[in-house]
Regions:
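Short loop/turn segments that connect beta-strands within beta-propeller blades
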Residues: 54-57, 99-103, 143-147, 194-197, ...
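Blade/loop signatures of beta-propeller domains
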Residues: 1-13, 138
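Beta-strand-rich domains and repeat architectures in extracellular enzymes and scaffolds
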Residues: 14-51, 71-78
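A flexible loop/linker signature enriched in serine peptidases of the S9 family
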Residues: 41-51, 67-73, 87-96, 110-115, ...
Length: 260
């Protein structure tokens, strides 16, 4: 067999851009809080679609004409789920709710700016999300029924990311950071108390992070006693756990590349 020499990168390959683009790409994957529904976002040929599988039933597409695509440049996710249905960050800049089972999507917010990370409260009454407009990012709140306008919960930082509810619905954690840092260079983990009556945050405190320390992925334990997060200090990454009752803090795991 005669071999022909060609410059690097110019030989024929069975892996073409068309073949790569035609494949299915999985993005958001999550369960509903009661564990009865598996939800995922996939795209094929650049077209996003939402699928739901309930129990042993076959998966069904529930996109129904929406384009699930958050418009925040650094990401944040397009989907959130409650026991009742799916919250969708749509390319138009609106949040939608699609119930499990019959029913069309319902718009919850006006078409304004771009958003991501729809995060329903444990009781299903509220929805946290990230919002950006004309270079201004913030953490916002909307009622899950869409009957009143969204409100600003936190602002002032250049970027917001990964909001999380305490199981009681009385506290919220999130990460934020400022220019010129990237989130893996330096960011802050914030914790605040949420007052549902006034729809405001109080007792806001920085738990970890700085211009030199990166933090991320805040997660409350199911019983609400602990808050865990990732922290990157110098060459090592850590899983940090805070006891919210006693204030004790410990490093659960100290290793490398946890943030990778």
């Amino acid at each position: 067999m005669h071999k022909k020499k060609q410059p690097y990168g110019l030989w024929p390959s069975p892996i073409t851009p068309e073949r790569i683009g035609s494949g299915i790409r999985l993005e958001d994957v999550l369960f509903s809080p009661d564990g009865k529904n598996l939800i995922w976002l996939q795209s094929q040929g650049g077209v996003p679609a939402i699928y739901v599988q309930s129990g042993s039933n076959a998966p069904s597409e529930v996109t129904t004409g929406l384009k699930p695509r958050g418009g925040i440049s650094y990401g944040g996710g397009e989907l959130g789920a409650s026991k009742a249905g799916i919250y969708i960050a749509e390319a138009s800049g609106r949040l939608y709710f699609k119930p499990f089972g019959p029913g069309l999507p319902q718009a919850l917010t006006p078409e304004f700016g771009a958003l991501a990370s729809p995060t329903p409260s444990p009781d299903g009454n509220w929805l946290l999300f990230l919002h950006t407009y004309e270079g201004r990012d913030l953490l916002a709140l909307a009622p899950s029924d869409g009957k009143t306008w969204p409100r600003i919960l936190a602002q002032g930082a250049d970027f917001y990311y990964q909001p999380a509810w305490h199981p009681s619905g009385e506290k919220i954690a999130w990460m934020e950071w400022d220019h010129p840092n990237m989130p893996w260079d330096g960011s802050r983990l914030q914790l605040a108390r949420f007052d549902a009556a006034s729809q405001t945050l109080t007792e806001i405190q920085t738990l970890d992070g700085s211009k030199e320390i990166a933090v991320g992925q805040p997660l409350f334990s199911p019983d609400g006693r602990y808050l865990a997060w990732l922290a990157n200090r110098e060459e090592f990454d850590q899983i940090v756990v805070l006891d919210l009752q006693t204030g004790d803090r410990r490093i659960l795991l100290d290793g490398s590349s946890l943030l990778a």
